[in-house]
Amino acid sequence: APNTYGPFPTNMVMAAGDTPMDELVGDLDRGLLVTRFHYTNPVHSKKVIITGMTRDGTFLVEGGKVVGPVRNLRFTMSYLDALANVEAVSRERRCLRGFLGASVVPSLRLSSFSFTGATAAE
């Protein structure tokens, strides 16, 4: 039977860019540094809308410096829209193991990303 989710990336590879990782953060006036997305699931396969959470470190950046942690955030967004907002791509890449395979990807700086909620304060 066909996969009811439609196409699903299991071994994704993305080309490196030309921006050093420290410049991705250092050039930010104000933004968020997200170190990991977790529990990502498809919401709409044709529009590539995914929902998930940040995990293992989400930080506020001001004046190019990490100034402190923020709570984990929920997102629901089209990955196609996110990729349309790429401002810079790191030259460094990482191999990340996932539930259904692995990905070799650089870090990205996006001009915008849609977060829809946050975890409760502790």
What is the role of each PLM region?
Residues 1-122:
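N-terminal small-residue-enriched
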